Amino acid sequence: MTFLLNIMLMSSTSQNVAMPYAELPGQCIQLTGDLVEVVYYYPNGSIKQIGFLENGNKTGEWVSYNLEGQIVVKAYFENNLKEGKWKVYNDEGELQYKIQYRNGKKVWAQEYDESGNTTAFNYK
């Protein structure tokens, strides 16, 4: 998933922002220095995604939710590059994939069935 956000924060208060890629409302809260927490919402008001920007780049954990509030992706970024272990869940909250990234490139991926058994493993 690629999410774009061009925001310049002038104060340490929270503010509402428009998300141009999806026209969904969002909120930015400056935490410390250049670290900003970003929260995106579905039109019904439920949280769609939470993550962090540092100097305008994605950093740390980003969590995406479905309309029912179930986690569908736990992702990690470092300086706007995919990094570390990502987990992808189905709408029932069951783990479907684990994907390992290093410097923005996929290192390996593991797929799971409904019972949690590994069904595929891909190493690059």
Language model features: what each stretch is:
Residues F3-K124:
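Glycine/tyrosine- and acidic-biased, solvent-exposed loop/turn segments at the edges of beta-strands
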